[in-house]
Regions:
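Charged helix-capping and loop-helix junction motifs
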Residues: 22-28
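C-terminal active-site rim and adjoining tail of enzyme catalytic domains
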Residues: 97, 101-134
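C-terminal helical cap(s) of enzyme catalytic domains, especially alpha/beta-barrels
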Residues: 130-148
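Single conserved hydrophobic/aromatic residue that forms the stacking wall/gate
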Residues: 1-7, 11
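Alpha-helix-loop-beta-strand connector modules within alpha/beta enzyme cores
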Residues: 28-38
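Active-site rim beta-loop-alpha module in soluble metabolic enzymes
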Residues: 47-105
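Catalytic beta/alpha-barrel core
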Residues: 18, 37-46
Length: 151
């Protein structure tokens, strides 16, 4: 097992995506969290099986949306390495975040609008412009009248 940071990130990402689709896995994760950290707020892909599992077990959940990722019509993320997986244009990504937060909608990669709940916005922090991007998103959300707060 490769325990490097990059490999660890891949495994976490895979587990996150798997738990978003597999209710039994999501239930197992929630049970472990409830036992070890009962006050923790779990982040889960908006509308996913993980959100349903967290709600069912009675833990606090934050529906997570992604600023710079494409969505499929079923609400899952477009897999990395495929067309439409990443939103490269910052202005487009910011506009999508504003719409997700204020209207509860995002346009999927087939052009349809899907319902989404945005309690938390994920921004990938591995790029050189990540902090500036987060600051722009925060300013745009505040300009749209959205209150930013910790949970």
């Amino acid at each position: 097992l490769d325990r490097s940071s990059a490999a660890s990130d891949v495994y976490k990402r895979q587990l996150y995506n798997m738990a978003g689709k597999d209710r039994a896995l999501a239930d197992a994760i929630c049970a472990a969290v409830k036992e070890s950290a009962p006050g923790a707020v779990l982040l889960a892909l908006s509308g996913s099986e993980m959100v349903k599992a967290v709600q069912a077990i009675g833990l606090p959940v934050a529906n997570e949306v992604f600023a710079d990722r494409g969505y499929r019509p079923d609400g899952s993320l477009v897999p990395r390495g495929t067309p439409d997986a990443m939103i490269e244009d910052e202005d487009e990504a910011i506009a999508r975040v504003i719409r997700m937060v204020t209207e509860g909608k995002v346009t999927a990669n087939d052009g349809t609008d899907i319902a989404i709940q945005a309690d938390s916005v994920c921004v990938h922090g591995d790029g050189p412009k990540a902090l500036a991007f987060v600051e722009k998103i925060g300013a745009a959300l505040q300009a749209a009248g959205v209150e930013l707060k910790a949970f």
